[in-house]
Amino acid sequence: MADMSVKQLADLVRTTPERLLEQLKEAGVAITHVDQTISDEEKRKLLLHLKTSHSTETDKKRSKIVLKRKKLSVVKSGKKSVNVEIRSKRTYTKPVVEQKRETEPAPTQEVPLTSDTTNLNEKAEVNVATLEKAVEAEVKEEAKKTPSEKKETPKKGPRKETRRSRKPDKEDKWEREELHMTKLVEERRRRHKPAHVPDSDSASAKLEQGFARPTAPVVREVALPESITVADLAQKMSVKAAEVIKAMMKLGAMVTINQRIDQETAAIVVEEMGHKPKLIKEDVLEENLVATLGEQIGEAVPRAPVVTIMGHVDHGKTSLLDYIRRTKVTSTEAGGITQHIGAYHVETELGMITFLDTPGHEAFTAMRARGAKCTDIVVLVVAADDGVMPQTVEAIQHARAAKVPVVVAVNKIDKPEADPERIKTELSTHDVLPEEWGGDTMFQPISAKTGEGIDALLERILLQAEVLELKAVDNGPARGMVVESRLDRGRGPVATVLVTSGELHLGDILLVGREYGRVRAMIGDDGRPCESAGPSMPVEVLGLSGTPVAGEEAIVVPDERKAREIARFRQGKYREVRLAKKQTAHLERIFDRMGEGKQNTLNIVLKADVQGSLEALTEALNKLSTDEVKVNIIASGVGGITESDVNLAIASDAVVIGFNVRADAPTRVLVEREGVDLRYYSIIYDLIDEVKKALSGLLAPEFEEKIVGLAEVRDVFRSSKIGAIAGCMVVEGVVRRHLPIRVLRDNVVIYEGQLESLRRYKEDVAEVRQGTECGIGVKNYNDVKVGDQIEVYEKTQVHRTIA
């Protein structure tokens, strides 16, 4: 019921305001003025006072007021709070007893029954009846405003009422506040939903939030793998992916929701968004494998040194090794240059030495670095007649990076122009000082052609090996490094493995990077099969699942299942990292490409004989790309050219290049039928030069302007046919007809066009030389003035090449 003033209530119950004030005073309500508002609680108190003042049976019957109302009550059971909409039937009888008990201690004075008191009682009865009717009328009016949706269940009504009656007054007040706040929402919900008492869970979900707003930012510890997508990163931080993309845009990186980012980038983003990154290493399988194998048990015994021969191209590295092995290895190399690593072991009178012959061409930097990585001693070959060259300096840098000692072999001393002292001087500028100059580097003059000084060189190598005290365990599971790998037709993937410790046997399970397999055959450097290989022994291994990457570590695993798991894990990780780098590079260049013109591309399908040559060729060809033309190697591999390679070239309009490999008969038929450009090469110089020529043809033509002559306007004539004719004096060069011209005024170009007519004494001429007057007609231009200059020039196309 709404609050009203005492005067309004008196008008409603049809009594005087003064009489009502007296009754309120008797009921203990502190209201002294007729304009004061009276609350619902004070009305109830007045009503109870009037009821208790009449104790007759009739009054008792009248004192039972039944209120039917629709109300939202809140019932709490444990942690749950349920709002239930009920229609209650209420009888006010119990508060009368409580009121009586409260008023028992107070002494009451009996009023004698007189005619005045009788009249007073009758008036009170009228007031009580009228007040009851007013209360019922207001209840009905409220019920009309909020029509009921469902009749009360007879069993639930008393139970809910009983629970409510046990609640304290404070909770009742909170219930009324809850009802007041949700009144409008409940009315809207009632209009559309069927009348039905909701379940406790659904009612709680609709009427109250299931969580509270955090008062402080939530800082989470985000576990980051080696690569993660933007969507997964957002989920780990419990934010939307758009927020992560915004944060990365602020950091200057453009990403998409499904793009993979590396661990370092993800850690920066997590810290930027206020969380703590936790880096996770996913190579647990590999760590467990290393822990399982542990240290190799056994006694370390002396082993042969692994010697890498380095130097500039054509300085005689392979010829030196050829003389040592007493074979003609050089004659088998195309063009007389080494294009992949050769691993050989040589038995000398002083002991065994394993040699690695690396290429000297600049494109084989990675192969040279790989050779220095798995070597003990570097023999630097320098031609006495050529001096220190760029690849010589690079070999010195590789040796220093690998922290291995260097022995300098000054080759070709048999030539008359040889100057070993000049070699020492040039090497000293690179901090390679000979022992006789106070340094620590051994120098040995040799001749790979006559054999002079070779025995002394071997002695120096073995002396250096004794100083290093090279030892290794010669039993147990083998470990090694892949020096080279290739795909052999008929034998499958072949890997040249240099054993560093342990002993490799036939049938061992070998894990090499992303490849694994059982060793089916081992072939020594002399071409003969062997059953085992110890430390410092190079062997060719057959039986791997694919061609491994040169430079990978090879390790013998006792369990094939474990080797398969690790290999597959490495393959997946390699793919994720490769995709992440590819997407990152693509998005970083997207805005750069928007402002550029179309870039011409030369697509290439590249096949090589060994993995090392393939890497060197790929790097060398990619270096040829410029801003205008680009080399795009769409596919590369080790082995012969197959029909699938040709079909790929047809689909992508590519050139097929084979380096020391050939196409089989069905593939050649397909090439001839489809007209695919197939080229074979065996020398890297020729391959790079041909690709340069092809790229030069893709370059946009470039024109050079050459000023032929300059004429100064002395007078202007008008012609009915041509228009303005400029009478000119040729001051420089020659003015020729049909050449492009520029009209200059105050040394500013105001028009570019074509020379339409050239006359001298009313005769058409082809050219006019310096110091001669002539008449010049400019095509489609009549605004020629005295004092202008007419510049005649010609354009010539310049042949462009790739540097």
UniProtKB/Swiss-Prot annotation:
Span list, region G4: 411-414
Protein residues bound to GTP: 311-318, 357-361, 411-414
Compositional bias of kind Polar residues: 111-121
Region described as Disordered: spans on this chain: 95-125, 138-209
Domain tr-type G: 302-471
Coiled-coil regions, chain positions: none
UniProt cross-references to Pfam families, sorted A to Z: EF-G_D2, GTP_EFTU, IF-2, IF2_N
Keywords from the UniProt entry: Cytoplasm, GTP-binding, Initiation factor, Nucleotide-binding, Protein biosynthesis
Composition skew (Basic and acidic residues), residue ranges: 138-155, 168-188
GO cellular component: cytosol
Keyword ATP-binding part of the UniProt annotation: no
Record-level Gene Ontology MF annotations: GTP binding; GTPase activity; translation initiation factor activity
Residues covered by region (G2): 336-340
Stretch list, region G5: 447-449
Compositionally skewed regions (Basic residues) per UniProt: 156-167
Region of interest (G1), residue spans: 311-318
Subcellular location(s) per record: Cytoplasm
Region named G3: 357-360
Family the UniProt entry places it in: Belongs to the TRAFAC class translation factor GTPase superfamily. Classic translation factor GTPase family. IF-2 subfamily.
Record's function text: One of the essential components for the initiation of protein synthesis. Protects formylmethionyl-tRNA from spontaneous hydrolysis and promotes its binding to the 30S ribosomal subunits. Also involved in the hydrolysis of GTP during the formation of the 70S ribosomal complex.
Name of protein: Translation initiation factor IF-2
Organism: Coxiella burnetii (strain CbuG_Q212)
